[in-house]
UniProtKB/Swiss-Prot annotation:
Protein's recorded name: Fructose-1,6-bisphosphatase class 1
Cofactor (UniProt): Mg(2+)
Pathway: Carbohydrate biosynthesis; gluconeogenesis
Family annotation (InterPro entries): FBPase_C_dom, FBPase_class-1, FBPase_N, FBPtase
Catalysis: reaction(s): beta-D-fructose 1,6-bisphosphate + H2O = beta-D-fructose 6-phosphate + phosphate
Pfam families in the cross-refs: FBPase (PF00316), FBPase_C (PF18913)
Residues annotated to bind Mg(2+) 2: 103, 106, 268
Entry's cofactor comment: Binds 2 magnesium ions per subunit.
Gene3D superfamilies: 3.40.190.80, Fructose-1,6-Bisphosphatase, subunit A, domain 1
Entry's Gene Ontology molecular function annotations: fructose 1,6-bisphosphate 1-phosphatase activity; magnesium ion binding
Protein species of origin: Shewanella baltica (strain OS155 / ATCC BAA-1091)
Length: 342
């Protein structure tokens, strides 16, 4: 089996990007170690702090965020970083070539019940000039690499550099990521969907109708039965989609009119959409292809519908969208050019 280093060489990934990917992979090994130790290391439970989204931070949210920050500061290729756990973008090195956006511990609410969590990351080119939040506001099409690390029964890294999606598994004895799937592919058809059904009453009418038709199974207009899956961690639900097909959605809702969307564009939706498209699937907000969105702020949220291409198309048809056309962009609040130097 190829190691991650050997694979990057075989794909002719340039040295600086390979170095950054290996830094992210090595840090994920340390995060995996911290997650496995859990209560033994006293790292479970919540803090009294909130992140910029107003979410209570888990102890491991802060620990894993600091681990990634420290590693990226030492890497030498990184110009700046943006994290779910940082209020503002962070300047790392004036000579860096790359910007890194990440969610250090996706699904951290699962950590206290020993369920799936993971790290999601996106790598963008660093533009010339002064680093501001605007430097990061590039569409998902600009991503040079993206991936996630899933901390489950095995620790797995799913990675794309724009040459398909490869899956690596961390060998428990050698501590090396080994290539275990050279070409992940999402089947166009599926009979599985993932959604938080507790929010059903808050969804827009098209999504309510779509899910209702799935639940009708063979006696409904879809004429086939569907199973529902929900891990409550995007990284776990998307891994299942990449592994065996399906559709994952966190749609628009009016539960909190000030926050109609749940998932963050820059370090959740964009990297996952890049992976899904590279594996033959589709990713949309319901009104626009995710990778085509022009971001307006670093913590911008969007609706997400992604997975098996034919099922995403079916979902979009309920929204009255011709998926061959480009709908109007989904906008958010104005950005603010703020950074922190480290």
């Amino acid at each position: 089996m190829q190691t991650l280093t050997q694979h990057l060489t075989s794909q002719a990934v340039n040295d600086s990007l390979s170095h950054l990917i290996l830094t992210l992979a090595d840090t994920s090994k340390a995060i995996s170690h911290a997650v496995r130790h859990g209560a033994l290391a006293g790292v479970l439970g919540a803090t009294e702090q909130e992140n910029v989204q107003g979410e209570t931070q888990k102890k491991l949210d802060i620990i894993t965020n600091d681990m990634l920050k420290d590693a990226l500061k030492a890497d030498g290729t990184v110009r700046g970083l943006a994290s779910e756990e940082e209020d503002h973008v962070v300047e790392v090195s004036k000579n860096g070539q790359y910007l890194v956006c990440f969610d250090p511990l996706d699904g951290s609410s699962n950590i206290d019940i020993n369920s799936l969590v993971g790290t999601i990351f996106s790598v963008l080119p660093a533009p010339a000039g002064e680093l501001t939040e605007t430097s990061f506001l590039q569409s998902g099409r600009a991503q040079l690499a993206a991936g996630y690390v899933l901390y489950g029964p095995s620790t797995m890294l799913a990675l794309t550099t724009g040459q398909g999606v490869q899956l690596f598994t961390l060998h428990p004895e050698t501590n090396e990521f080994l290539l275990t799937n050279a070409a992940m592919s999402i089947s166009p058809e599926t009979q599985e969907f993932a959604i938080n059904m507790s929010n059903q009453r808050f969804w827009e009418a098209p999504m309510q109708t779509y899910i209702a038709d799935l639940l009708l199974g063979k006696i409904g207009p879809r004429e086939k039965s569907f199973n529902m899956r929900w891990i409550a961690a995007m990284v776990g639900d998307v891994h299942r989609v990449l592994s065996r097909g399906g559709i994952f959605t966190y749609p628009t809702d009016n539960k909190d009119p000030k926050k109609p969307y749940k998932l963050r564009l820059m370090y959740e939706a964009n990297p996952m959409a890049f992976l899904v498209e590279q594996a033959g699937g589709k990713a949309s907000t319901g009104y626009e292809t995710i990778l085509d969105i022009q971001p307006t702020q670093i913590h911008q949220r969007v609706a997400v519908i992604l997975g098996s291409s034919n099922e995403v198309d079916a979902c979009l048809s309920y929204h009255g969208i011709d998926y061959s056309e480009e709908p109007n962009p989904q906008n958010s609040d104005n950005n603010c050019d703020t950074l922190i130097e480290v």
